[in-house]
Amino acid sequence: MTEKKYIVALDQGTTSSRAVVMNHDANIISVSQREFEQIYPKPGWVEHDPMEIWATQSSTLVEVLAKADISSDQIAAIGITNQRETTIVWEKETGKPIYNAIVWQCRRTAEICEHLKRDGLEDYIRSNTGLVIDPYFSGTKVKWILDHVEGSRERARRGELLFGTVDTWLIWKMTQGRVHVTDYTNASRTMLFNIHTLDWDDKMLEVLDIPREMLPEVRRSSEVYGQTNIGGKGGTRIPISGIAGDQQAALFGQLCVKEGMAKNTYGTGCFMLMNTGEKAVKSENGLLTTIACGPTGEVNYALEGAVFMAGASIQWLRDEMKLINDAYDSEYFATKVQNTNGVYVVPAFTGLGAPYWDPYARGAIFGLTRGVNANHIIRATLESIAYQTRDVLEAMQADSGIRLHALRVDGGAVANNFLMQFQSDILGTRVERPEVREVTALGAAYLAGLAVGFWQNLDELQEKAVIEREFRPGIETTERNYRYAGWKKAVKRAMAWEEHDE
């Protein structure tokens, strides 16, 4: 029998599908990536073609093995991590979607959300699902599809249609329609799942008129869900044994499995999650209560804060403002000046996320004087990412009563040393950057590997988690608080900018 030397993580993201092969030392052997089309039918609407998600993801799996010259019988297991909340409804019989995938960023269900608020459901939804009422989550997207595709609700009642987030869709395709499952982390992002009883919430299903028959079975994040054949019939059968939504996978990949440990992912937006152990902490400060993975993939809880504009604000400097040619240049120009010369950039281009949740805020630059140049604005834009992270951390510490001692970081922007140092300065906390940057894929690989005994336990993984660089605060508390007070003043003035009917 061939030795099982590798784990494959499938990382299905918002703009691309990736496959990553890792060995027993958690080193990356090979990566394959394919982008796919973003569909914008109307302003504020975002869709993907589910068949293209499947085509790109399945081809990266074949490609990554070929690239590394690994045969499929050397693979111990496959783990899946995915863009969360994105919603797919398909026919059970044919496996064909009845509508495009409605993506997490899509705002088309804003009106449905307003109705839920008017019906006084905010408190119920926050208490039972851990979420705020927002188009971001899957529930209203499923309702929208059932409302707009003729006859679909009746078909769903008859058991002819299935709903799934992206993880569920991929497993359904990989097992030729034999397995219809999701995991607790993905279920906790639907606004249909009761995070205390760990079951679909009957009241939410009734309110949104979603038939229970179409929902997947919900399982732990680390167990064998089914097998997939690589190389068609008669090919190698490989267990699929790990699932987690991308941010929860990153939390696990950073080994934040103890209460009070937190990570921040700096991507297009920022996502900070703090593990709160076995207790679900209800946020009084605009954060989400969500499900995370415990040491063996069991249910833990986490607080989550999402910042909409992080890396995206650097892209704005490059693409719209033409102040830089490449995102990497931002660090160079930011360090050409001593400070921002009193300037604050509030990148509320699509409103503000946690802890403000103000869809009517808009981007602004404050504190302009005659001496301000492009470098000051570039520096202030980078600093805004760190300030927004502090906003979320303050809310987390207030909710949980836990004082953070170190923040683990990952994502594209962590390569920026200026930003990481400023982050440490403004938080007054150590910032730890890991050696392996692919922590989302790492989390999915860990969950899959633990389920099949490829790794025995977390202690074995702890040895592999190397911190590449630690940033420590380099400014005084008075200076830190003075700068942060300026940020708070700027945010206040950017809020409620856009007119809206009360």
Swiss-Prot record:
Instruction: Name the top EC class.
Output: transferase
Its GO biological process terms? Answer: glycerol catabolic process; glycerol metabolic process; glycerol-3-phosphate metabolic process
Q: Which cysteine residues pair off into disulfide bonds?
A: none
Q: What regulates the activity here?
A: Activity of this regulatory enzyme is affected by several metabolites. Allosterically and non-competitively inhibited by fructose 1,6-bisphosphate (FBP) and unphosphorylated phosphocarrier protein EIIA-Glc (III-Glc), an integral component of the bacterial phosphotransferase (PTS) system.
Record key words, sorted: Allosteric enzyme, ATP-binding, Glycerol metabolism, Kinase, Metal-binding, Nucleotide-binding, Transferase, Zinc
Known catalytic reactions: glycerol + ATP = sn-glycerol 3-phosphate + ADP + H(+)
Query: Function, please?
Result: Key enzyme in the regulation of glycerol uptake and metabolism. Catalyzes the phosphorylation of glycerol to yield sn-glycerol 3-phosphate.
Name it.
Glycerol kinase
